[in-house]
Amino acid sequence: MRFLAATILLLALVAASQAEPLHFKDCGSKVGVIKEVNVSPCPTDPCQLHKGQSYSVNITFTSGTQSQNSTALVHGILEGIRVPFPIPEPDGCKSGINCPIQKDKVYSYLNKLPVKNEYPSIKLVVEWKLEDDKKNNLFCWEIPVQITS
């Protein structure tokens, strides 16, 4: 099981290392500072997300607090309406972060963004938050995306 987890982590790191840093909007990182946001593959702005594919997400950030755990929340925002966007692993401590989280330490958060075939072909904003154990945002970022066939 550890070998499988290590292999997945290695593949995510390789994919993330080939990604270009994205221009993102910080949407309220209260107890952390985002250093870099990478979504791979995402060669254009806005990101073209193709239905049926999964995208690697790598966020490098510095924690401004201690926390025993962390939870990711992802939403699609369309005309001001926030719709939950399910991700495979909402537990930040299982997404490249060694918990407990320490203050002033740099972390690389790794996850996947699956784009389901049943999603409509639309433009929207993806909002991705990682909350600490007190529900404060370790990071919060937004990027515009286009879901396509």
Swiss-Prot record:
Q: Which Gene Ontology cellular component terms are annotated?
A: endoplasmic reticulum; extracellular space; lysosome
Residues of the signal peptide = 1-19
Give the sugar-modified residues: 58, 69
**SUPFAM superfamilies assigned:** E set domains (SSF81296)
For domains, the record's comment is: Binds cholesterol in a hydrophobic pocket; there are no hydrogen bonds between the sterol and the protein.
Oligomer and partners: Interacts with NPC1 (via the second lumenal domain) in a cholestrol-dependent manner. Interacts with NUS1/NgBR, the interaction stabilizes NCP2 and regulates cholesterol trafficking. Interacts with DHDDS. Interacts with NEDD4L (via C2 domain). Interacts with NPC1L1.
- What name has this protein been given in UniProt? NPC intracellular cholesterol transporter 2
Which organism encodes this protein?
Answer: Mus musculus (Mouse)
